[in-house]
Amino acid sequence: MTLSWPSPAKLNLFLYITGKRPDGYHNLQTLFQFLDYGDTLTFTPRNDTQLTILTPVEGVADEDNLIIKAAKLLRQYCYQHHIPLRYQGADISIDKKLPMGGGLGGGSSNAATTLIALNYHWQAGLSDETLATLGVTLGADVPVFVKGHAAFAEGIGEILTPASPKECWYLVAHPGISIPTPTIFTDPELKRNSPIRSLGALLQAPFANDCEMIARKRFREVEYLLSWLLEYAPSRLTGTGACVFGEFESQEAASEVLINAPEWVHGFVAQGVNISPVHLFRSRIPVLLHP
């Protein structure tokens, strides 16, 4: 059975860095929400063990693609735990809409969708909790995509508490550049001492992103784009960038700003959703049983 699975974007509605750990990672507090917009991954199970990307991503070798890494990780876990699989290979196509290095979680989302989809197609029968534990070895953001609910994240992003922020409409704009995460986190001027607060306190305060000042200072494209968007709506950087987003009360309001935007502005309008489109899709497809 061939199925096309959503691989949604995420936004960091706020992001505060509360300290740097001895191992070099940063402790943070952030609020993840999904978007009803993203990539689409199509999986066709194979009777052999081949894992083939039919639509290679430019600049990313197959062996470095998180999709392939996730598939191999799932298969290896099942081998090690003597879990029988209906299939062990797959042909995979990617309809790529999310920019790399954009702060929208595209790679992590692809990995999570792969774990969820192949768990279904291969009939491995693993729980989302197990898939999330596998996923964190691929990236700190993978578990939130696997678990599929908007969440308040702490620690390095691995401590998740389900949350239900308002499902607003957003204009998400991309400045045409990629920002590697280490570029932001290694900057000596990055704020690393935000106070640790409860989710309730954070929801009552104006939302902000501690990475934004560095991104605006080091990348003029981000500065120009955010300055433009702030004229129309409360706007922030997502993650470590490079994408920015403005918050609107309606799809029409966000779309009107995008339609009338300068030619150099590239973006899309999407709604924030607290249940991942991947989980909604999975709930609507038939349960597969071993023959």
Curated annotation (Swiss-Prot):
- SUPFAM superfamilies, per the entry: GHMP Kinase, C-terminal domain, Ribosomal protein S5 domain 2-like
What EC numbers are recorded for this enzyme? 2.7.1.148
Pfam families in the record? GHMP_kinases_C, GHMP_kinases_N
Q: Example GO biological process term?
A: terpenoid biosynthetic process
Which residues of this UniProt protein bind ATP? Answer: P99, M100, G101, G102, G103, L104, G105, G106, G107, S108, S109
The broad enzyme category this protein falls into is: transferase
User: Where's the active site on this chain?
Assistant: K10, D141
Name the pathway it acts in. Answer: Isoprenoid biosynthesis; isopentenyl diphosphate biosynthesis via DXP pathway; isopentenyl diphosphate from 1-deoxy-D-xylulose 5-phosphate: step 3/6
Q: Which reaction does it catalyse?
A: 4-CDP-2-C-methyl-D-erythritol + ATP = 4-CDP-2-C-methyl-D-erythritol 2-phosphate + ADP + H(+)
Keywords in alphabetical order: ATP-binding, Isoprene biosynthesis, Kinase, Nucleotide-binding, Transferase
Q: Which GO terms describe its molecular function?
A: 4-(cytidine 5'-diphospho)-2-C-methyl-D-erythritol kinase activity; ATP binding
Which Gene3D superfamilies does this one have? Answer: 3.30.230.10, GHMP kinase, C-terminal domain (3.30.70.890)
Q: How does it assemble?
A: Homodimer.
Q: Which NCBIfam families match?
A: ispE
**What is the purpose of this protein?**
Catalyzes the phosphorylation of the position 2 hydroxy group of 4-diphosphocytidyl-2C-methyl-D-erythritol.
| Protein family membership | Belongs to the GHMP kinase family. IspE subfamily.
> Mind telling me which PANTHER family this protein's record contains?
4-DIPHOSPHOCYTIDYL-2-C-METHYL-D-ERYTHRITOL KINASE, CHLOROPLASTIC
Can you say what this protein is called?
A: 4-diphosphocytidyl-2-C-methyl-D-erythritol kinase
| Protein's organism | Proteus mirabilis (strain HI4320)
The gene it comes from is ispE
